[in-house]
Amino acid sequence: MREIRSVTAQYDNATLGDAAVEGLFSGMIAGISMAAYLGMVNLMMGESLLETFARFAVSDDATPLLGFLLHLGVSGVYGLVYGLLCRLIARRWISYPFLRLSVLMGCAYGLVLLILAQVVLLPGSASPLKEISLTHLLIAHLIYGAALGILTRTEENSLH
């Protein structure tokens, strides 16, 4: 019981800035895991990694590097938001971030991001991401969310 109080006290000493920065970097790492999954799936379907990464950019003349960097940037921003949400909301009613709960919260967040993309962001666009199967996008977002939940929990445990 003392260990839980100690971790909670350490967590309370962390600033919102700490949570934002840790969420940013965790989001970028989780974005790499998501891109790796989509890259492997598309390789098995005959598409090169360069073609896959170019899909992440919105213009027709996008380079794979630009697409990958844009994906990392968006993943980082979503991770930052997740880090802040966890700090401001979720940790108010969770005394200790158990691994299973962290993964579940991350997966729920990934699912929300997928719904946001499918309902708000992609319908009015000519994005090549719309050509990727919804099943694979779902799995990719769950991978992103699970990785984000694990990484954010790991970062919280190392705050001090």
Q: Language-model features: where?
A:
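Juxtamembrane/disordered regions of integral membrane proteins
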Residues: R2-H160
